[in-house]
Amino acid sequence: MSVTEHKKQAPKEVRCKIVTISDTRTEETDKSGQLLHELLKEAGHKVTSYEIVKDDKESIQQAVLAGYHKEDVDVVLTNGGTGITKRDVTIEAVSALLDKEIVGFGELFRMISYLEDIGSSAMLSRAIGGTIGRKVVFSMPGSSGAVRLAMNKLILPELGHITFELHRQ
């Protein structure tokens, strides 16, 4: 079956959990979380869960695993904590949970960021994607620009297709 055929069979509505990782954001100040919600809704997807967690490995893993265990979640989207400071532990937390890494997500995110957005600063991004069982997790930087780029260029065009692939096994 071709990619085109897979995309035709893919679900039109994907159920998502948004996790914002920040020591300072609140629901009112979480612009990237709000942007994720808007972009998903505009694309016809459903946000079934949303939370803000602190920049610590255990809290991040608990939030991701809570999404994994929920029946009404197909995808967990995290934003924040992907940089190189001491407090940035999202990648370590998420990668320890993954069954399979979607290596192309991070590679393409950095390439597009380099070419279209932030130039050589793209090398500092540690965005990651992967699967846990039949669910997918994408972890992206916390800036609104990075969220918009990741969603519009990479995640939204493939969200239904990825969900289809994980459920046809």
UniProtKB/Swiss-Prot annotation:
Name of encoding gene: moaB
Family: Belongs to the MoaB/Mog family.
An example Gene Ontology CC term for this record: cytosol
Name this protein carries in UniProt: Molybdenum cofactor biosynthesis protein B
Key word Endoplasmic reticulum present: no
Keywords annotated in UniProt: Molybdenum cofactor biosynthesis
Subunit structure: Homotrimer.
UniProt-listed Pfam families: MoCF_biosynth
Taxonomic placement: Bacteria, Bacillati, Bacillota, Bacilli, Bacillales
Protein task: May be involved in the biosynthesis of molybdopterin.
